Amino acid sequence: MNILIKKSIPNFITLSNLFLGFTSIILLSLSLYKDSYISTACYLILISCGLDTIDGKIARKLNISSEFGKEIDSLADLVSFCIVPSLLLFIHYIKVIPSEENNFILLILLSSFPLILGAIRLAKYNALREMRESQKYLGLPTPANAILVCSMILFVHNIPFRMFVNDSIFYQFLSTIFLDYQWMILNVAIVSSIL
């Protein structure tokens, strides 16, 4: 395999993660006009999580880890797993809570928790070289938090799924939590960002 192509594979995967994060931001902006874009943005972030899992593994397996790769990975993580979940929370609540009940400043502040705390976590991870090399995480990794936020939003927005499981006790329990208590998703997202 050509050495240039070999060295490009992990970075291409990481840049694909970044591209999907950017595409999710665009879709979330468009979701103000069409609901289905919210679900599509969530699915793209779930794919980004898979890409984030394999890019580092491939780099280590091919023995081509680089400082550039580590830095671009953190940037992609910031976009896909910090900015997108915060924007996702904000847009979700703009859509489900009547505008006369929305306190935009409070909503912006609370929705920013995944972004701010995720950025702090990524900066700490990059600053502590020995922690990065041991591959131990402190707290909940940003991709896991993004999966949690996307899963909750998908549950609320995925009507076809609800048609098949409406009678199950599990669905009734989750719908009580997430549909009847609209602020529960934001509360869970904030707590998981703090972890």
Each model region followed by its residue ranges:
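C-terminal membrane-associated helical module and adjoining short loops/tails
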Residues: 1-2, 134-195
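Topogenic membrane-insertion module of multi-pass membrane proteins
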Residues: 1-53
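Hydrophobic alpha-helical transmembrane segments of polytopic
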Residues: 13-16, 41-48, 110-113, 117, ...
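Transmembrane alpha-helical segments that form the membrane-embedded catalytic/substrate-channel core
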Residues: 52, 115-127, 187-195
